[in-house]
Structures are given as C-alpha cells and as structure tokens.
C-alpha cells in the first residue's frame, strides 16, 4: 500500500498561534481533511535561525476556510502569515524490516542513525481502520512467559491485550523490558515498543540494555517523550501500532506491541481536548476518552492466523483503580497484572498482586485442569492469609489456631516463591534471570501447598526459579 497523492498541494497561511495550537487559513475550496498533515517552515531560535519543517495535524474545521491544527513539534519561531502546505495525506511512518533495530519519533524520522542510510521503500498512514469483523481470529491460546506468578495466576493470551497496572516505582517498566527480552529469546518474535510520554532517561536505558542483550535487532522503537508537545504523545502509539500492523498483515508474523505508558496517551488526549476548547468530563478528562481508547485498542487484535499481542503499562494515579483513565482501559483487556506497592515494599519482585490480578483464560475451558486447580489452591491459601492479617496485627500469630498457623506458614512460603529473578533486573541484583516452564511451576506450587517443603526456611523460597533452585538455596542454608 502506498500513500502518494497526485493532486496539487493546497497552500494556506498561519492565522493564529497559541502554544501547540495553530489556526491556518486555506482557500474555501481547498480545505485539508481532518487528520491531514500540514507542513510549515520556521526559523528555529534554538538553532541560530536554521530552517526546519514543522508538521501540524488538522484537528478541527472552524469554517470560512480556517482549520485548527495541533503541532507535532514545538512552535518556537512560528509567525503569522507563514505559508503552510497541505500534504494531502495523514502522518505516515516507515514500515517493514527497515524499522528493526531503529528508533523513531512520531513522524517516522529515524533518531539513532542518519535517515539517508535507511532504505525506506514503503510508508503507511498512522490513521487506519481496524480489521473487519470477519477477519478476526477467535482461537484462544496461552502465551507462556517463563515467569511463575504470571503463567500460573494471570496467564496471558496470545493475540490478547495485557495491562500492567501500578503506581509510580513498582516495576512496570522493568517488567516490560523483561517481556521484550523473553519474547526475543523464547519466542523468536518481532517486537514494537511505543514510549508514550515517559522519561527520556528510561528510553535511553532501554535502548542500551536492548543493545547489550542483542534484542534490539528484532525490535522497532517509537518514542514521544514527556518533554514533547501533547500532539506527539497522543499519536506515538498509533505510529508504533502501524509498524506492528505491517508485520502482522503483510509479513504474516506474530508481533508483540509494548506501550509504556497508556495513561500518558490518555493524558495527552486530555491536554489536546482542552487546547481545542472541549468541555471536560469526569475528573477533568476529555469527553471523548472512551472513543479515543477504543480507536487504538480495536486495532490491536489478531487476524486469521497472525496476532498482535500487546502489553500496556498503565500508571494508576494515586493508586486509585477507579480513576477514569485506568477504568476505561480495563474494558479492553484480556489479562490484568496489578503491581502492588505493599508487595514491592516486601522486596518481592515482580510485585504482582496475585489476588487483584485477573485473566480471561484462567478457566478450565482454556487451560488444563491441573493448572486451574493449582492456581485456585494458591489463591485460596493467599486469600485466607490475607483474611487473617487483621487478627495477626491485633493479637499476634500465637493466638491463631493450629490450622490457621499452618495456613500462614505455607502462605508466606508461597508468597516468597512467587518472586523470581528477572533478566532485566540483573543490573540491580547482579543475579541471572530464570525461566520456569509452566508444568514445573504447577508441580512446585502443589508440592509447597501439600507441605512437602514446610521444613525449608522462608528465605530459601525468596527470589528463586524452580524446585531445583529452591533445594540448592535450602542446602546453602544448611537444610537437606
């Protein structure tokens, strides 16, 4: 699919500039369509007046030939009456193998090497329709990650949408980095990463780590960081998704799409909505919140035989899961992995809350009976332990009955055994990551719940892989 437009480009003039919002006047019979990209040349004050091309995206038709556009770059140096060219098409990004190993901005410009060196042969527009209903794949298949807590308690769906919920600093980005490494190593798949409104330092660290671990060559990265205008942050997820769609639809590959952070996408939408003068709705969010989220999420799907599996980090403002931004995202997800601050404070990583996290396929219709039984058993023990917490806090553990003491004894071991060393956290811990097959996880948790390892000290269960790791740690602590 090509995006060339044969018509002569219409030219207008800048009528008004207010921050990233630019009003442009065109001839009434040559107004650009909504979502068209406009180009305007400016003298950049930061570069001693060097000329650069700004890209604007049409957001509203105000009438009488005037359109309101949102700038994708800072508008410093833009003046009234500056000539503006309508490109006749929306923003486009490069697609195909040329994107692997490269870092792009929202406009598809390469950031980590000279653009002239890249052999870009095809570009797709970022605004595209979702696949037709009859093209969708209805088969449900589990996506194994090698992380015990995820595979056992919140199994991911191949071609599904996975949400990583958590407040600041509980490990969302580390878990996403871990999944990128695991996908490249375990599944030999293509990954596309969208950095939406996150810290530039984190993006830089991610690129360095991916280069070191050798997975950068299988990944395309698209960044629209915190310091960029809201228009860029609102569109960066669509740019990355377009690259992923090409791998799925043309190259017939299974793709993993990582979005960090989907909350910043909502936040950018809220800023743009306010700039366009729309009336805010609940908690100050844009009135089109559900619609904008739906447009993005409906394109992330599986078509016949090929899938886009997406993992989305979702910042939870003030740890409040009822906030409209995370609440709107919930409706689209197949699995939710809730990262908990109290669990991260215990030093248990990944800090997944086993009772709050859910999965659509944690059901005997989709997974084995053994898997379902083990997951239910583990959740049951942890739930009972949680129910006893108040009594323990007030009266102490000695006031519990023998049966309850045994539940607490085993639950503490189960809780610690849910922790695991990850490849991405090696820089913090100095320990190699571990991969635990699902069958081994099921057998290990059944054995712990049966009391086979009641005589092992609690610290032996902490940050280990499978049963062999557990036994080796116990031996180090002097227990056979």
Curated annotation (Swiss-Prot):
Keywords: ATP synthesis, ATP-binding, Cell membrane, CF(1), Hydrogen ion transport, Ion transport, Membrane, Nucleotide-binding, Translocase, Transport. CDD domains: ATP-synt_F1_beta_C (cd18110), ATP-synt_F1_beta_N (cd18115), F1-ATPase_beta_CD (cd01133). It holds the Pfam family ATP-synt_VA_C. One of its GO terms (molecular function) is proton-transporting ATP synthase activity, rotational mechanism. ATP binds at residues 166-173. It catalyses: ATP + H2O + 4 H(+)(in) = ADP + phosphate + 5 H(+)(out). It is found in: Cell membrane. Gene3D superfamilies: 2.40.10.170, Bovine Mitochondrial F1-atpase, Atp Synthase Beta Chain, Chain D, domain 3, P-loop containing nucleotide triphosphate hydrolases. Signal peptide: none annotated. Its EC number is 7.1.2.2. GO terms for cellular component: plasma membrane; proton-transporting ATP synthase complex. SMART domains: AAA. It is a peripheral membrane protein. Its main location: membrane. Produces ATP from ADP in the presence of a proton gradient across the membrane. The catalytic sites are hosted primarily by the beta subunits. PANTHER family: ATP SYNTHASE, ATP SYNTHASE SUBUNIT BETA, MITOCHONDRIAL. Belongs to the ATPase alpha/beta chains family. F-type ATPases have 2 components, CF(1) - the catalytic core - and CF(0) - the membrane proton channel. CF(1) has five subunits: alpha(3), beta(3), gamma(1), delta(1), epsilon(1). CF(0) has three main subunits: a(1), b(2) and c(9-12). The alpha and beta chains form an alternating ring which encloses part of the gamma chain. CF(1) is attached to CF(0) by a central stalk formed by the gamma and epsilon chains, while a peripheral stalk is formed by the delta and b chains. NCBIfam families: atpD (TIGR01039). This is ATP synthase subunit beta. It comes from Streptomyces griseus subsp. griseus (strain JCM 4626 / CBS 651.72 / NBRC 13350 / KCC S-0626 / ISP 5235).
